[in-house]
A protein has these predicted regions:
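ATP-dependent carboxylate activation and anion-phosphoryl transfer catalytic cores
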Residues: 1-11, 15-21, 32-34, 45, ...
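A general structural motif
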Residues: 4-9, 56-59, 80, 311-317, ...
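A short, GP-enriched loop/loop-strand-helix hinge that lies immediately N-terminal to
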Residues: 5, 19-59, 74-79, 353, ...
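C-terminal accessory/binding modules appended to enzymatic or scaffolding proteins
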Residues: 294, 300-313, 317-366, 371-373, ...
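Short amphipathic alpha-helix with an adjacent loop that forms part of the alpha/beta core around
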Residues: 11-19, 87-93, 388-396
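A conserved helix-loop-beta module that forms one wall/lid of the active-site cleft
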Residues: 50-111, 373-380, 434
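General beta-strand structural signal in soluble alpha/beta enzymes
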Residues: 4-5, 26, 47-50, 77-80, ...
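Feature captures the catalytic cores and cofactor-binding loops of soluble hydro-lyases/lyases
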Residues: 344-434
Length: 434
């Protein structure tokens, strides 16, 4: 039977009272279902698959950090704080930028990257006004390559259908990232390290079923971002492209079948003879007041899959399927406006666009940085102060917009206005330099 009920303790208990199940599977209900584990366990309801104790070990920061330390697996330094002064002290001790987020976060909700004391104060004022009960986590933000692994384990062996690499660097929610399988810039030695770490974590957490692990590579070292003791949104994607029925295998493992008897082997699964790219789909044309800048907070509402003989073909198919316009018009113009942190990096991107025949337009500070090395660029006024930006969009002279900005409220309003007009006109607005 199928029930359409909210995942609240009382509603779930009513269903259990009617159905009288032998146990409950929480691994396929996302983070909301995982948060019910302690409650169900305290009521004597058997948890099928990974135990409540193991789930708590993966979710509890101190216990999980102790596990990582035992295996000498790196993680970005961080602290849990409850007040404004503690947050500022932690941020300055760790060094900016830092990642701020509530404990037990869902979908990256209320997660931000802060670059200075003022941004920490602004964030903590919002969080503290909501009367938080759990600590706010302050983590050192490391900008590196991000990877994601879905693992099936029976407690003795593990099967890793595939390792996915994000095109965007860390700091963008995994649901909003473009994910590529197999990874496109990871060497065999690092790939083996990822497999070894995944096996250690899955087995030491006594996983029975699915577990999702997110990694980053920073300065040649592997770091664990987080471990989710459940199925992730990438399970349908990786199942489709590898041919491994992950949900079916995980369910069989949860009820006691050994992984080796299921016919898909153990360890890292064989690579297919093609490349698969997962591209997020956004709904900003309907959610007009949303801030479209990619961040640790998830904003996508769907995803599409592109397959190709190589990464370029798969990415092209994925972008077109997601609704992006990827051809040049007769004018072939690109509007660029980036914050100070991104200005050194935009120079090489602008040079490549210039070599491809695009006409470049940029706001004052960005234009100065681009022209410093001799790239031709036409200066337009700042957002919110010069209508020329919108005139260029309306005239059809802009094919793409590259836009990254500060977290100042005034700037965000201008950003939302510009992004919404781009969506209305069908002009791709890129908010991440990757």
């Amino acid at each position: 039977r199928l029930y359409f009920e909210p995942l609240f303790p009382e509603d779930v208990m009513h269903i259990i009272a009617v159905e009288k199940p032998v146990g409950v599977v929480v691994a396929f209900g996302g983070q909301t279902a995982i948060k019910l584990t302690k409650f169900l366990d305290s009521r004597g309801i058997p948890i099928l698959g990974t135990s409540a104790e193991s789930i708590d070990m993966a979710e509890d920061r101190e216990r999980f950090d102790a596990l990582l330390e035992r295996f000498s697996i790196k993680r970005a330094a961080g602290r849990g704080v409850l007040g404004m002064n503690e947050a500022l002290e932690a941020a300055n001790e760790l060094g900016y930028p830092v990642l701020l987020r509530p404990s037990y976060v869902i979908g990256g909700q209320n997660m931000v990257i802060a670059h200075n004391d003022e941004e920490v104060r602004r964030y903590m004022e919002i969080i503290l006004s909501g009367k938080i009960e759990n600590p706010v986590l302050v983590d050192q933000y490391l900008m590196g390559k991000e990877l994601e692994v879905d693992v099936i384990s029976d407690g003795t062996d593990v099967l890793i259908p595939g390792v996915m690499q994000h095109i965007e660097r860390t700091g963008v929610h995994s649901g909003d990232s473009i994910a590529v399988y197999p990874p496109f810039s990871i060497g065999d030695k690092m790939l083996q390290t990822i497999v070894d770490c995944s096996e250690k974590l899955a087995l030491s957490l006594k996983t029975r079923g699915l577990i999702n692990i997110q990694y980053l590579i920073y300065q040649g070292e592997l770091y664990v971002i987080e471990v989710n003791p459940r199925a992730s949104r990438t399970v349908p994607y990786i199942s489709k492209v590898t041919g491994v029925p992950m949900v079916d295998l995980a369910t069989r493992v949860m009820v006691g079948q050994p992984l080796k008897a299921l016919g898909y082997g153990t360890g890292l699964y064989k690579r297919p003879p093609y490349v698969a790219v997962k591209v997020p789909v956004f709904s900003f044309e309907k959610i007009t007041d949303a801030n479209a800048a990619l961040s640790p907070e998830m904003k996508s509402t769907g995803e599409v899959l592109g397959l190709g003989a190589n990464m370029q073909e798969a990415l092209f198919k994925g972008l077109v399927s997601a609704g992006y316009k990827v051809e040049k018009s007769g004018h072939a113009g690109v509007l660029i406006s980036v914050n100070r942190r991104d200005q050194p990096e935009i120079v090489n991107i602008a040079r490549k666009l210039d070599e491809m025949g695009f006409r470049l337009y940029a706001t004052d500070g960005t234009a100065r940085e681009i022209s410093r090395l001799g790239t031709d660029v036409e200066v337009v006024g700042k957002l919110g102060r010069d209508n020329r930006v919108f005139q260029l969009l309306e005239s059809g002279r802009i094919d793409y917009v590259i836009l990254t900005g500060s977290t100042e409220p005034e700037y965000i309003r201008d950003f939302i206005h510009l992004n919404h007009r781009c969506v209305q006109l069908g002009i791709p607005c890129l908010t991440s330099l990757d």
